[in-house]
Amino acid sequence: MNHIYKLKSYGIGTDRRFYGVANKTLETPDFLDPVRESFDWFLHVGIPEAFDRIFPIVSANGKLEISFRRGSLRVEKPENEYLAIREAKIKGKTYSARVYVTLVKVHSEDGEMEEQEILLAEFPFMTQGGTFIINGFEKVVVSQLIRSPGVCFRENVRNQQADDLFNKVEIIPQLGSWMEIFHKVTGNQVDTVKFRIDKHKNIPLLSFLRAIGFTNETVRKYFGNSPELLESIRRHKLESLEENLELIYRIVRKDDRITEEGLKNLIPSIIFNERRYNLASTGRFMLNAKLNLVERISQTYLAEDLVSKKNKILFKKGTYITRQLALEIQEKFNNEEIPLSEIEGVDSTIYARQLEITRNENLWKRFYVAIVKVWPNKKSMLQESEPVNVIATDPNLNEKTLVLSDIIAIVSYYFNLLSNLGKSDDPDSLVNKRIVSVGELLQNQFLIALTKIEKNSKEKISTKSDLSQLTVKSIINNKPIYNQFKNFFNSSKLSQFMDQINPLGEMASKRKVTSLGPGGLNRDTAQFEVRDVHTTHYGRICPVETPEGQNIGLILNFSVFSRINQYGFIITPYYQVKNRIVDYSKVHWLAASEEFDKSFAQSGVEIDQNNRIIPDKLTVRKNQTYLVLDAEQVNYIDVSSMQMTSISASAIPFLENNDANRALMGSNMQRQAVPLIKSEAPLVATGIEEAVARFSATNLRAAISGKVTYVDAKKIIIDDGEKPEIHYLRYFEKSNQETLILQKPTVKVGDKVKKGQLICDGPSTDNGELALGKNVLVAFSTWYGYNYEDAIIISEKLVKDDVFTSIHIQEQTIKFRSTKAGNDILTAEIPNASAKSRLHLDANGIVIVGSEVDTGDILVGRTSPKGEDNPTAEEKLMAAIWGKKALAQKDTSLRVKNGEGGTVIDVQILSRDQGDNLEEGVGMLIKILIAQKRKIKVGDKMAGRHGNKGVVSVILPVEDMPFLEDGTPVDIVLNPQGVPSRMNIGQVLELHLGMVAKKLKTKFVTPVFDGIKIETIKKLFDEANIPESGKFKLFDGISGQAFENPVSVGYMYMLKLLHMVDDKMHARSIGPYSLTTQQPLGGKSQNGGQRFGEMETWALESFGATSVLSELLTYKSDNIQGRNLLYNNIISGGKIPSPGTPESFNVLAYELRGLLIKLEVHKNDQENQEGEEIKDPLELPEIPSNFIDEYNQDGRIELNKLEEFADFDEENIDFDKLTR
């Protein structure tokens, strides 16, 4: 043994060698916990919270009130989750739960109360796997990353339209109007400060301040004398409160008539009304955090003594304020040791008015702020220049709306920035972004629905004269809730069809984060800055995994350890470090805002047995940069080397040796790996494979601890001595992507199991570890040009031994309808169908399970009534004799689609007679499931885990494959030119380590960023008796000659991807045409043709291939008459007709007609613009045949001997044209 390693156990008894440095790493959490916790929050907190916001519902006349009894909420979900989900999938239903609630109706006149429990809603319920079953399909609701409510200050922001720079502050609520204060900082003139509500026109900031009761003096007193403020005061002409309110009213309410009541209510209704303007707890938290004193008074000098309530001087004038001191001052304001100042000189009528409307006794708190006078620098202190007022909001506020203290603090901060106090915010930082999880998204839908219920209820009450007849049930209609959820799950961008190819893809789709969707960004306008990786993403969002293409950087994935806190911010775990000692006893979860001024070391730092950091100097992360600091200055250490990356990226061994672009492709392609017939765990793993298998919904964990008493392919029974627990296995199920879901038991009768232990292997799982591909012997060498441009050469052995064979399940459905013309009939007697196509049908006309069917075979026999149009003479006679029409039947059977042949594995019949819920007019629906066994073929896409992808170009006989000195043929030959420019060296390291693993009959684990070092691999070469270079002598299988140079050969983990040639290969001989253009349709699904486009036309034009071009653009395309004539003429052996007008020309003419332009084609119109007749020089009188015969003999005709040609000048006549 050459190097110290630990043997770590993974999955079910797999030992792997671990050579990493990391001392103690946090165990990976259950990856689906955040999703499940969020839904749980919705059930227990979100729904009651929504009720509190809408109820009580009070009638317009105030006589009737309907309130919600707290604690009465009851959620009723199906008893057996497995059976309910299975039924929902087969029958195309939604797996849902019922919500019951007790509502109280109160008559204000006589105080009479009536209580009633009602079924409020039935909405989709989350499965244990974090998904929803909607109409039989499994869907996931992805989390959304959006701007956090609160306040965001920005300096020198470039305007999109012009090249001007602006300072601005955005006040963002969760519900309500966005507000903005801004002014231009470029240009020669000092700009006035403006204010904007939503997308309305700009209003002078002074108008807004005046409208909430400020005078010029108060404005100067609080916000200083900056040039911008003085310019704003100088230019502002409206003096009275009413004039300013009127200006704002005209801009915001536009065409509404101005009334006294409207003016009074204007600002309170926009800002202070909780139902119209809501910051939520997150917004209030952000406001209080941003609008405190700390950021602005740090590194300044006090310009006055700070005195306590007891008149004791706490901080003297002239004191230099460090960040620590600033925190102390803020703390003293928080606990009111230093008194807050009352806001003076503000007209309180607006607030009195609001108090009158909302009865909000806390309103008067709004009049207090914390004020500190400071000098920005030493120079201004020595010169005793005018100090700057720093105003912070009341630190103890908890209102969900804006308050006057907030407005004053925001405006103060805005002007403080001009004096270089405070700091501007980064909108792309995770400090200013939050996650809206599934629970909150569902709560939003629930709130919208409750608002509709409130409106409908009030309307219903107002129409009834006798209120005593109304019951709670008759007033509250739950339809809006059902419709709202149905709409959300079926059409929202955030409700997505689950990626179910393999367990990794499934896990990644549940942990996806999108910046798109309602309230998010637009992919067409999103700038580079928004898409880029940000330093705050560390440990929260993966910097690697994101789609290629237009969604890059907008769709992201959570990192392995990230969680979401109560405010919706992503938090990540760390161990605390004090005086070089790491405290492993407690995990600290930090949000991005809490990382300011702290230093973080990586998990791979060497630590001794006493948990003391060994190196004296460390590279640490601090305030968005990397520094080398003393070990004593480290505050925190990462909990794991996988902390930075997502699950998919963490599954790439030697990720640190790959270029990020290729790592991105590698993590995306692993999610597309097809589950193979026999799964095989990788020789070189990263350690996350076991966690993925353990937490994946496609694998089954024991619900209880106990003894296994029964095992078969469909169920496992565990008995704990009290009650046996049945665990149902998924058996030959179709996934969303048509791959196979099959669970195989890994326990035997008599085994003892613990709760939470894996008891089966699902798809792409091997002994409790994720197994997406196969370990195959790979050589990096060129071979007769067959692996040019990333093509892959594979051995026939991989095909024969079913190494890369996968099973795919196609579903075909047929409906039996009842129409006026008659009913569809299920039958085995199908008119004009061949005996071969009916071979597999039973007596009823349904295919027998187990049949091997091929393209065109009938799966379900169905005949439908023919339409009544144009009856034949015979049909008329029959109708006359029998008094009714003899209904003719046409064959409308379900046949195997092109390329979808295979083995029939299941037949599912849904019928209205059996109580199944089918769409209107459908009496029966039959589903046929066909399984295909797909071996690897030329054209299939394969990939490694490092972004090294390619297409199979040739399958060679084993004897032709290059072989090693001992005669072992390689399985795959890859092109070595695919490595240097792509810079994914990880694949080479994996190749060598795989060879070592095979020789030593062991397996390795090499976690990302804590992997096996190259020096260790070299030492392992000695142990395994492998040449130091890792290269071997290779021989050509065809010539038997040795290759000129040694070749890198080893075991690499290769995947077969979902992009298979069977799904893509397509040819058309005859097929459907588009009705409008009369051109063949496009695409495989429609049996379409290959488009001969504009550029292909240019190519033929450039060669002058007129005949080819003519027939391509007419007969073979959209010349209807021409192609029909052509068909007839080919059959009858006639001449090819002349090409007519293509239909697309008529489409163009119709298009122009819609624009009032008449386009006509005139063939040989005999008049010119002046109305004179035009003679066609070729339209000459017919020449008698004897003249032509003479011409043919001696080559001349004396045309002027003929009367008709007397006027013609012989010299100008082209005789060849005349006689042709």
UniProtKB/Swiss-Prot annotation:
An example Gene Ontology biological process: DNA-templated transcription
Q: Name one Pfam family in it.
A: RNA_pol_Rpb2_1
- Reactions catalysed, as given in the entry: RNA(n) + a ribonucleoside 5'-triphosphate = RNA(n+1) + diphosphate
Give its E.C. classification number. 2.7.7.6
One GO molecular function term of this record is: DNA-directed RNA polymerase activity
**Keywords of this protein's UniProt record, alphabetized?**
DNA-directed RNA polymerase, Nucleotidyltransferase, Transcription, Transferase
Which branch of life, at top level? Bacteria
Gene Ontology CC annotation, any one: DNA-directed RNA polymerase complex
Stated role: DNA-dependent RNA polymerase catalyzes the transcription of DNA into RNA using the four ribonucleoside triphosphates as substrates.
Subunit and interaction comment = The RNAP catalytic core consists of 2 alpha, 1 beta, 1 beta' and 1 omega subunit. When a sigma factor is associated with the core the holoenzyme is formed, which can initiate transcription.
The record's similarity note reads: Belongs to the RNA polymerase beta chain family.
Put simply, this protein is called: DNA-directed RNA polymerase subunit beta
Which species is this UniProt entry from? Answer: Mesomycoplasma hyopneumoniae (strain 232) (Mycoplasma hyopneumoniae)
Upper classification of the organism:
Bacteria, Bacillati, Mycoplasmatota, Mycoplasmoidales, Metamycoplasmataceae
Gene that this sequence comes from: rpoB
